[in-house]
From Swiss-Prot:
Name of this protein: Zinc finger protein 593 homolog
Region listing for Disordered, in residue ranges: 1-29
Name of the gene: znf-593
Biological processes per GO annotation: ribosome biogenesis
Main location, first listed in the record: nucleus
Superkingdom field: Eukaryota
An annotated GO cellular component: nucleus
Length: 128
């Protein structure tokens, strides 16, 4: 067993053995037609919150809207959004960098505007 100081640095098996989606796959999910489908999923009782509260950037399901809003304020979410603002490389750029193929004009990467997610009102339950 590692001591207390070493235990903090070990990666849990869940994180190590079940990696999430790659950034290019998340970029595909951010396209408007696919994002709309992910945000309006059918009810799935196996997922947290029945699959209704999903963060596309972090590919996580949440129990309720309040938890998802709290997640959006965290450093983890903000860093993921910052990482996703970079445009992914295309196959043509990769071939040109590797020396095979020709890419006429390599420009600086520009920022991608992420689609704004619709505000879903939180229903207020009257206390009796």
């Amino acid at each position: 067993m590692p001591s207390g100081g070493q235990r903090k640095h070990t990666i849990s098996n869940k994180t190590r053995k079940r990696p999430g989606k790659d950034l290019d796959q998340i970029h595909e999910d951010l396209k408007p037609e696919k994002a709309a489908k992910l945000l309006q999923q059918e009810i799935d009782y196996d997922l947290p919150g029945n699959g209704q509260f999903y963060c596309i950037e972090c590919e996580r399901h949440f129990v309720d809207e309040k938890t998802r809003q709290l997640h959006r304020k965290t450093k983890l979410h903000k860093n993921r959004v910052k990482t996703l603002k970079e445009v992914p490389y295309t196959q043509a750029e990769a071939n040109a960098a590797g020396g095979s193929g020709f890419f006429p004009a390599i420009t600086l990467k520009t920022r991608v505007e992420l689609p704004k997610q619709p505000e879903i009102p939180i229903p207020v339950v009257a206390e009796t």
